[in-house]
Amino acid sequence: MVNLLSEKTSGTNVAEFTVSEIAGALKRVVEEKFGYVRVRGEISGYRGAHASGHAYFALKDDKARLEAVIWRGVMEKLKFPPEEGMEVVAVGKLTTYPGSSKYQIVIEALEPTGVGALMTLLENRKKKFAEEGLFDEAKKKPLPYMPRIIGVVTSPTGAVIRDIIHRISDRFPLHVLVWPVRVQGETSGSEVAAAVEGFNALASEGHIPKPDLIIVARGGGSLEDLWGFNDEAVVRAVYASDLPIISAVGHETDWTLIDYVADWRAPTPTGAAEKAVPVKLDLEVCVASLGARLRKGLARSFDFHQQKLCAARRGLPSADQLFSLPRRGFDEISSRLQRALCVSYDKKRFSFHALHLRLSPRLLKSEKAQRHTKEYTARLYRAFMRSVEKKRSALELACRLLKSTSYQNILERGFVLVLGQNHKPIKRLAQFPESGQINLRFFDGDIHVATQEPFSAARSKHKKIKSPSDDQGTLF
């Protein structure tokens, strides 16, 4: 620092520096003076890791605030993820950021300030979720008795998945789907939540079958190791799941928030496998036992009803005794029917004989003639009616023809019939009288008209009309 000041002294006692020189000098002083430090404070402004994987937040107490940064490589190695409001002890190097004239700590290790801080945070979350009703027993779903497919959310390389698969294979071999996740570290909570949501999003008839049950499992560990299963995203994903979920996180004494929201909590991953599937051999023994009991019950029922049938048969009369009375009645009815037929035959024969005596050939001929007379009368009447109808049709045709040729129809169309004094029609101009009266006949009456103009004068005013030929017919 002395060398820097001595180099920049020029004629006065005030040193002159560039901004970069001052910032660099301060950075070197801070880093050389403090080196690695341990800082206790409360995390503030944490919003999760950046897209680059780095995390930026601040450590504060009641009087001061210190900016902090965790690089991506360190974030992936943390035993528990940072959370807003958590009191921690950060280990790292103090440095400055020349671009904004800030000093900060680059964290290389981060630990909560004892288990008490984590337990306080855990209890606060537990109380919050309980008030929202996420832990209600009435909302938990029943587990399927014999699932076809089981989905397991755990690490694919740990002993947990081997124990689960081995236990399921021993009890009831079936299809197991594994969704690999990190079960410890910064991203464990988000990965477990995504796995639960992913299993629920599978199609029932898709290429990857949808499981009937989900097991979320992890081995034992410290509170920090299991902290990812206390993540809010995990709790809400399990609560929103349509598939029943068994939680098997840690040992029997380890409780996480997923254990409260899951539909069933198993003390160990092996216990989860035992709860998920029954023992196939026990089912076979049970089915065999039920089959044997069913066969014995059917045999006893058959024997009982057979004994009742034998007892009833002993109480019944023999076939001869049973049919003797009906047979006697049948014989009596047969004999009575035969006698009745004979009597009826004799009566009919006597009746026919009496009718025969009453009949004679002359009477038969008279009846035959009457039948012929009736038949001829009917035929004559029908012929007469046909003739009458034929004449009526001809008369109607003549009437229609007469009506069509009548001059009355012509008068109705607006024509006038001119009649002379002798009441004969005037057909030609030459027949028109030179003086006197004529009669004009309309369709609805006659009118008398006197001719005042001489016939010769009337003829000269009109063009001569060609007289019709003699072979032309007349309407009158």
Curated annotation (Swiss-Prot):
Localization per Swiss-Prot or TrEMBL: Cytoplasm
Pfam families (UniProt xref): Exonuc_VII_L (PF02601), tRNA_anti_2 (PF13742)
Keywords: Cytoplasm, Exonuclease, Hydrolase, Nuclease
Main location as per UniProt: cytoplasm
Coiled-coil residue windows: none
Catalyzed reactions per annotation: Exonucleolytic cleavage in either 5'- to 3'- or 3'- to 5'-direction to yield nucleoside 5'-phosphates
InterPro entries: Exonuc_VII_L, Exonuc_VII_lsu_C, OB-fold_nuc-bd_dom
GO CC annotation, single: exodeoxyribonuclease VII complex
Subunit description: Heterooligomer composed of large and small subunits.
HAMAP family (alphabetical): Exonuc_7_L
Protein name: Exodeoxyribonuclease 7 large subunit
Organism, scientific name: Bartonella tribocorum (strain CIP 105476 / IBS 506)
